[in-house]
């Protein structure tokens, strides 16, 4: 198949490149508006208890769970004439909007409500509303209201917060972060590619394919928005993934093409040979990454599902562009792929000699790997112990869903959230629970009384009255019951994501209700989300392990190497998760990164990072094993040959894998500049994983383990050997001559 693709691509190179240019232009135009069509939610499933309760509240009880807050502050106090005028005006205007219901404010609410809408310092009053239309419409409405009323005038400051405003700020920030990340990554990538290849022309090719992948990623995301909800967080992640993989894959193919030219092949034959060999590696790598991302579709959350759909499509686009477009460009360029040597001027400036080619057996990588294999057992023990130690903080991981603290301290929604936590202890801003008794019109006095006696509950608001510690303290707030049923609000200062918060939720559930009760609120959302993720996680892990094992078995014909790869990847990712807990949950380096440690991680992020990092780690595993296997098949297949072929394989791939890892780290690392905290975690975690995987894992641990296992590396039971002979992926031609290495380069 690869041979036919390469032959077709090199037979009609101009037509293919013109078609690619037209496709890139279409993708760019079609995907330009994608950010405005993406959603900020997707952290809970539609059939979860909290989701069903939220729908009933939205449909039957206007404003029961406000998703929008305006904070009106005056140094002269919330009761000053200026604050009252602004607060009343804002509440009235929002109340006239068709997409706003349940509007209430400190200045217009009755006494039972009014007291809790004023800050403890007396300077701030609140305007609450529920913005309808779903997450997308609500966040757009929040942005419009914030633009109209936000700011400071006549000594009164108005700021927007609440879930809808948070979503709007996140959408806006992520779009800005994407522009910044690409602005940082692309120039740095161009510089590193030029250093790696020397030739400006050769360096431009992976970058061009990467830009094509970005355009394709935007168009793919936009296309999926026509049929399903797609998370806004997929914007940065899939474009970064597309750029990183496209550059990675192109680097392998361009390097192999230049090698084949040095070996004496003609332009077209060299391009075809590059696709047959490096293209085969690219195909397996893309298949592994795509399968790992596809596993995300088993989770019933569109936050993860959108990564499955868009991620697989972007991986396919990056691989296809590398396998189809690059050969066309390479055959047209021919020897000019080595033109414009940017390093020549630097060598003349510093009086350095021209590089000479060194056989792999004389390279630094070859010597290093042989030393590692001579000390295989201690090297293995030290690295495994270090990875386990780094991963140990993951044993104390805690999970919770994102709130305004994912945003930087300077954002309006973050400022409002901080004010609510500090100055409005009685406001139910998600910390408590809202309980829906759908279709029930009976008395709830006993139920409200019992709920108010639960530890940590500060008050219970119900149609029977306001209850504190078992006693009725005030008349019932209006609107808590109607023909559809009724709801109760449980106010608490307990962190919903803490152990105490989950314990309190269980105690509230245990209180006998007069009718079937549905719980809403952050504690219930957290419990529902963790249950949903936990129920599907074993299946996801099993599918990733199985798919990786099958692909690597078809690639190598061994059952030992796939098992080793799965175990090593799991160990490597455990270390990465330990570092993320240490930094983002426990707060180490938080000042350096500018993030707020909340004491927990967003539970969907480790799953997303596990699937993606697992697939990406296999990228270098496949590339390394492909070269080791080529040498192994050409050998006598003895124990000594095992040692020699491992050293040869690492020597062949060490420099190019290091360069590929550095390039991928630049693209992913640019996301650390993001202002949304768990996007920073995503970028930093994957960057560290890629760098560690390409150096410590592939350069040290894998050779050490392959030395310890000897010829057993290539073992498979008889039936599986025959299965591989029939269905496995085999070399299409003889193994190529060794890839020389530039002297003096790592």
Model-derived features: where do they sit?
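Membrane-embedded transmembrane helical bundles of large multi-pass transporters/channels
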Residues: 1-37, 115, 133-399, 514-517, ...
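Loop-to-helix "switch" segment enriched in basic
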Residues: 38-42
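Structured non-transmembrane domains adjacent to transmembrane bundles in polytopic membrane proteins
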Residues: 46-67, 74-167, 396-591, 600, ...
């Amino acid at each position: 198949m690869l041979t036919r693709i390469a032959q077709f691509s090199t037979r009609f190179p101009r037509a293919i490149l013109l078609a690619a240019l037209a496709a890139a232009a279409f993708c760019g135009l079609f995907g330009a508006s994608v950010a405005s069509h993406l959603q900020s939610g997707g952290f809970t499933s539609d059939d979860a208890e909290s989701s069903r309760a939220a729908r009933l509240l939205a449909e039957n009880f206007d404003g029961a769970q406000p998703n929008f807050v305006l904070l009106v502050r005056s140094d002269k106090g919330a009761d000053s004439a200026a604050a009252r005028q602004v607060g009343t005006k804002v509440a009235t205007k929002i109340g006239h909007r068709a997409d706003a219901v349940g509007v209430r404010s400190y200045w217009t609410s009755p006494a039972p409500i009014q007291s809790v809408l004023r800050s403890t310092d007396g300077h701030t009053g609140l305007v609450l509303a529920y913005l309808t239309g779903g997450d997308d419409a609500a966040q757009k409405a929040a942005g419009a209201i914030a633009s109209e009323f936000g700011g400071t005038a006549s000594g009164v400051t108005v700021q927007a917060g609440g879930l809808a405003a948070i979503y709007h700020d996140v959408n806006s920030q992520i779009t800005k972060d994407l522009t910044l990340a690409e602005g940082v990554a692309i120039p740095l990538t161009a510089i590193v590619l030029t250093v790696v290849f020397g030739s400006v022309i050769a360096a431009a090719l992976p970058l061009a394919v990467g830009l094509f992948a970005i355009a394709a990623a935007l168009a793919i995301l936009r296309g999926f928005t026509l049929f399903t909800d797609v998370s806004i967080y997929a914007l940065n992640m899939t474009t970064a993934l597309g750029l990183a993989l496209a550059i990675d894959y192109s680097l392998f193919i361009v390097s192999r093409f230049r090698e084949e030219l040095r070996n004496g092949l003609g332009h077209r034959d060299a391009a075809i040979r590059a696709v047959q060999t490096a293209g085969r590696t690219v195909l397996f790598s893309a298949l592994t990454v795509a399968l790992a991302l596809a596993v995300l579709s088993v989770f019933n959350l569109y936050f993860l599902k959108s990564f499955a759909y868009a991620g697989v499509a972007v991986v396919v686009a990056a691989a296809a562009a590398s396998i189809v477009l690059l050969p066309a460009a390479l055959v047209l360029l021919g020897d000019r792929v080595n033109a414009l040597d940017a390093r020549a001027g630097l060598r003349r400036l510093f009086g350095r000699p021209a590089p000479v080619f060194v056989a792999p057996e004389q390279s630094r990588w070859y010597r290093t790997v042989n030393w590692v294999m001579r000390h295989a057992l201690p090297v293995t023990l030290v690295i495994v112990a270090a990875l386990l130690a780094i991963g140990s903080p993951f044993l104390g991981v805690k999970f919770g869903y994102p709130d305004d603290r994912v945003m930087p301290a300077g954002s309006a929604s973050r400022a409002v959230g901080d004010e609510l936590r500090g100055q409005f202890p009685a406001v139910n801003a998600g910390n408590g629970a809202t309980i829906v008794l759908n279709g029930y019109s009976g008395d709830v006095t006993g139920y409200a009384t019992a709920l108010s006696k639960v530890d940590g509950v500060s008050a219970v608001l119900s149609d029977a009255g306001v209850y504190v510690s078992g006693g009725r303290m005030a008349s019932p707030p209006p609107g808590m019951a109607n023909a559809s049923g009724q709801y109760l609000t449980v106010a608490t200062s307990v962190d919903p994501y803490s152990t105490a918060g989950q314990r309190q939720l269980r105690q509230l559930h245990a209180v006998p209700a007069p009718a079937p009760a549905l719980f809403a609120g952050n504690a219930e959302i957290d419990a529902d989300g963790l249950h949903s993720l936990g129920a599907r996680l074993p299946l996801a892990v099993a599918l990733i392990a199985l798919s990786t094992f099958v692909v690597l078995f078809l690639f190598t014909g061994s059952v030992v190497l796939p098992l080793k790869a799965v175990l090593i990847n799991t160990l490597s990712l455990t270390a990465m998760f330990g570092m993320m807990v240490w930094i983002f949950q426990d707060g180490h380096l938080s000042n350096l990164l500018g993030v707020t440690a909340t004491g927990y991680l967003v539970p969907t992020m480790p799953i997303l990072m596990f699937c993606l990092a697992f697939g990406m780690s296999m990228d270098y595993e496949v590339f390394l094993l492909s070269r080791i296997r080529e040498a192994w098949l050409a050998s006598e297949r003895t124990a000594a040959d095992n040692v020699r072929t491992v050293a040869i394989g690492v020597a062949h791939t060490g420099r190019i894998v290091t360069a590929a890892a550095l390039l991928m780290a630049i693209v992913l690392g640019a996301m650390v500049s993001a202002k949304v905290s768990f996007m920073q975690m995503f970028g930093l975690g994957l960057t560290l994983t890629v760098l560690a995987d390409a150096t410590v894992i592939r350069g040290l641990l894998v050779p050490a383990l392959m030395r310890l296992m000897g010829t057993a590396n290539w073992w498979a039971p008889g039936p599986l050997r025959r299965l591989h002979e029939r269905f496995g992926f085999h070399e299409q031609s003889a193994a190529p001559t060794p890839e020389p290495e530039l002297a003096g380069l790592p």
